[in-house]
Curated annotation (Swiss-Prot):
Gene field: rplE
GO molecular function, one term: structural constituent of ribosome
Keywords: Ribonucleoprotein, Ribosomal protein, RNA-binding, rRNA-binding, tRNA-binding
HAMAP family listed in its UniProt record: Ribosomal_uL5_B (MF_01333_B)
Gene Ontology biological-process entries: translation
Functional summary from the UniProt entry: This is one of the proteins that bind and probably mediate the attachment of the 5S RNA into the large ribosomal subunit, where it forms part of the central protuberance. In the 70S ribosome it contacts protein S13 of the 30S subunit (bridge B1b), connecting the 2 subunits; this bridge is implicated in subunit movement. Contacts the P site tRNA; the 5S rRNA and some of its associated proteins might help stabilize positioning of ribosome-bound tRNAs.
Name the record gives this protein: Large ribosomal subunit protein uL5
Family: Belongs to the universal ribosomal protein uL5 family.
Quaternary organization: Part of the 50S ribosomal subunit; part of the 5S rRNA/L5/L18/L25 subcomplex. Contacts the 5S rRNA and the P site tRNA. Forms a bridge to the 30S subunit in the 70S ribosome.
GO cellular component: ribonucleoprotein complex; ribosome
Matching InterPro entries: Ribosomal_uL5 (IPR002132), Ribosomal_uL5_bac-type (IPR020930), Ribosomal_uL5_C (IPR031309), Ribosomal_uL5_CS (IPR020929), Ribosomal_uL5_dom_sf (IPR022803), Ribosomal_uL5_N (IPR031310)
A Pfam family annotated for this UniProt entry: Ribosomal_L5_C
Length: 180
């Protein structure tokens, strides 16, 4: 069992049950999945950019990314319906817990001038999205082997019913949220 999952069972569940007065342990919010997305505008001109980003994302997550395609044609961005414009990976189970553990304890502390993540990025349904400006904060990525610095969006999908519950849940699992 991953260290984060153990922490969830031993510390987070009792603390959340105490604070929110849940009657059943199944009411306690849990992490359902983590979705990592890289939107790539440059893939329109440079088709090889997708392959390099795919290798980076595969190295970070340990899972094969899925290519996302344009839903509609947009002349202003020079994209047509069906063009490859990004990548995404959905992590669940033990891979998800391992990734979140690495993100909180290894990757985020490597961000320059890091003072915590924004507490305002909740969507109203208990999900949290974190934007990263570069993939280099992950120790698996070798600085000499990358072709371009790319950002990514990481969405934490929780079973929380409100943002307040999700905020407390993420704080308890160790997410360094800035005080708002």
């Amino acid at each position: 069992m991953s260290g984060l999952k153990q922490k969830y069972i031993e510390e987070v569940i009792p603390a959340m049950m105490d604070k929110f007065k849940y009657r059943n342990v199944m009411e306690v919010p849990r992490l359902e999945k983590v979705v990592i997305n890289i939107g790539m505008g440059e893939a329109v001109q440079n088709a090889k950019a997708i392959d390099a980003a795919m290798q980076d994302l595969r190295t970070i997550t340990g899972q094969q990314p899925v290519v996302t395609r344009a839903k509609k044609s947009v002349a202003a961005f020079k994209i047509r319906e069906g063009m490859r414009i990004g990548l995404k990976v959905t992590l669940r189970g033990s891979r998800m817990y391992d990734f979140v553990d690495r993100l909180i304890n290894v990757a985020l502390p490597r961000v320059r001038d890091f003072r915590g993540v924004s507490p305002k990025a909740f969507d109203g349904r208990g999900n949290y999205t974190l934007g990263l400006k570069e993939q280099l904060i992950f120790p698996e990525i070798d600085y000499d082997k990358i072709d371009k610095v790319r950002g990514m969006d990481i969405t934490f999908v929780t079973s929380a019913k409100s943002d307040e519950e999700a905020r407390e849940f993420l704080r308890l699992i160790g997410m360094p949220l800035k005080p708002h």
